[in-house]
Amino acid sequence: MNISELGEFGLIHRLTDNIELKNESTKYGVGDDCAVLEYPNKQVLVTTDMLMEGVHFDLTYIDMRHLGYKSAMVNISDIFAMNGTPRQMVVSIALSKRFKVEDLDEFYVGLKAACDKWNIDIVGGDTTSSYTGLAISITCIGEGDKDKIVYRNGAKETDLVCVTGDLGAAYMGLQLLEREKAVYYGQLSDLDKKIKDAKASGNDELVKNLQKKVNELNDFQPDFAGKEYLLQRQLAPEARGDIKEKLEAAGIQPTAMMDISDGLSSELLHICEQSNCGCRIFEKQIPIDYQTAVMAEEMNMNVTTCAMNGGEDYELLFTVPIGDHDKIKDIDGVKLIGHITKPELGKQLVARDGNEFEIKAQGWNPLKK
C-alpha cells in the first residue's frame, strides 16, 4: 500500500494504535502536540541518534525489521552507558516514495521489539517525506538517581578498565556483508553488460537466458553458515542493560562509563581526555569471539585492529576502583583489560610481545569524507 493512500493521520494511527504505556513517568503519549512525562526526584537523561541511509545503514543487506530494532538499541545503549534506566522513546522518520506502508510496519515491529525488551514507551515522533532515501532520528529518554549517574569524566589513577562481551564481531559482520554485496553487484554488472551486447547483436535467445540468470542472482542467498554470530552483532546489537543490573547487584558503581559505538580506541581516548588521565590496555586481555578471529584471518585483517577500531559493538566500557577487583572479576560477561594511569604516561596498548604502542582514534567518524 502506498503511504499516500493512508495519509499522515492514518499512518500515525496504524503505527501507534496498539502501543501500550508501561511507565508511571509517562503521563500522556502519542495523540497530542507533546508527550507528557513526570520524573519526581530523578535526573532525566536524553539522547538522540540520527541514522542516514547510505551512511549508517545499507538496505541492500539490512531489512526494515532489523533496522527498526537496531535503531532503537543504539539509543537505549546510551542510557545504560550513563547507568540510567530507559523509559520513553520518540521516533521520527523521513522516507522517499519507494517505501510502502508495509515497510514502515516492519520497521515498527523491530522498533517495538527492542522497546518491549526494556519496557520503553513510544510516546511520539514525526513522519515526513524525503528526496534522498530513508532518514531516522530517535530520541530516548531515561531516568537515574543523581548519585548513581555515571559520566565519562570520573576515571581515576589505578582504576581498573573493563569491557563487556566481546569486540570486533559487529565490524567483521559488516565486512562480510560488504564482501557479499560487492560479489553480487559485480556479477550483476557482468550480466548487464552481456545482455547489452546480446541485444546489440540481436541474439534474443541469449538475452532470454541471461535475463533468467539475473533473476536467479536476485533470488540467491549467500551461505553464512558458521558466521551467524557476526551477522547478529551487526544487524541486531543488544544494549547491555543486563550488565548494569549485574553491577548494581554486586554493589559496584563505575567511576566512568560509555558505550562502544565508534570503537574501543576512540572511547578510551574520550574517557582519558575527559578524566585527565592515561591508560594501559593489554592486547591479550581484549575479548574476541572465535568467529571474529576466523573471519579476520579469512579476510587477511589484524583481529586486534578490528576489535580496537571496528565500532558498533555497543558493549560497555567502564572503570571501577581497584578495591572492587574481587567483586568485578567473577561477573560473567565482564573482562578486565587494563588500568588507568597518570596523564603523562599516555594512552598505551601493551602488545602480546610486551611492546607498547600509543592508542590512536581510528574508529568510525561520521563526518569524515
Report residues per predicted region:
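Helix-biased detector of long, well-ordered alpha-helical tracts
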Residues: 1-369
